[in-house]
Amino acid sequence: RDRYEGCPQTPGRWLVIAEYAAPKTIDPALAQARMLDILAIAPRILDVPAEHVHAKARMRSRGGSQYGKQGAGKSGSGERANIARRRLPLIEEGGLTFAVNFDDYLDVGIFLDHRVTRNLVREHAKQARRFLNLFAYTGTATCYAADGGVEETVTVDLSNTYLDWAERNMRQNGFVGPQHHFVRDDVLVWIRDQRQTRNRWDLIFVDPPTFSNSSKMGRRTWDVQRDHVELLAGVSRLLAQGGHCLLYTSDA
């Protein structure tokens, strides 16, 4: 149970209520009634205005990309431009601000349950010079690393939409300049390429999806149970001497 707290530019408080679609063994009317009860009670208990409550339904599926869309359709340059033009709400966390999108995606741009992990990134960043964020999503960990004092960041994700979002988050917090790099690539392919260079990082944060079969990966799929050994072996070769890697996974 947690809430999204606004910042002075967009004050307020938001609540997202998400549940998996009920199995066929459950009466749809009972499932709907339960959800309506939650929508009626939760905002009162958590002191969130009704217009700031967002309900989302998830499907138990292993397909698709890392972060699903709320509606149908594919992400493209037109959608990226549309999102960039919109005035998304800004929330505050740990002295930083982040843009959130409650309407277009199942995940809104920041995972509240990662808050402790982001603080760990900032603490480790105080002793690091170069930071690498793999499977970066909207770059919130990069913002924390920059706030911790690293001199250079590299943010890698397969999605142009999320890289744009990450750059926007960095800019919102005053972290701009040629020392901050945003790379659109398949992470495993990118790691293999970097092993041929002298690029090494003092702190690497890795937050892989459980599963992905994004069309951007070609014929290859990603499964964290199958591929984590290759991933960690590759990451270990990109660490500077005395460097640290922080791995986050929600896969049981």
Model-derived features with residue positions:
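Conserved SAM-binding loop of SAM-dependent methyltransferases across substrates and taxa
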Residues: 140-149
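S-adenosyl-L-methionine
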Residues: 164-199
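Conserved small/polar residues in nucleotide/adenosyl-binding loops
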Residues: 248-252
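Conserved SAM-binding motif I beta-strand of class I
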Residues: 152-157
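Non-catalytic substrate-recognition/targeting regions of SAM-dependent transferases
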Residues: 34-111, 119
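Non-catalytic accessory regions of SAM-dependent methyltransferases
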Residues: 1-22
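Mobile active-site "lid"/loop adjacent to the S-adenosyl-L-methionine
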Residues: 162, 201-234
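Conserved class I S-adenosyl-L-methionine
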Residues: 129-134
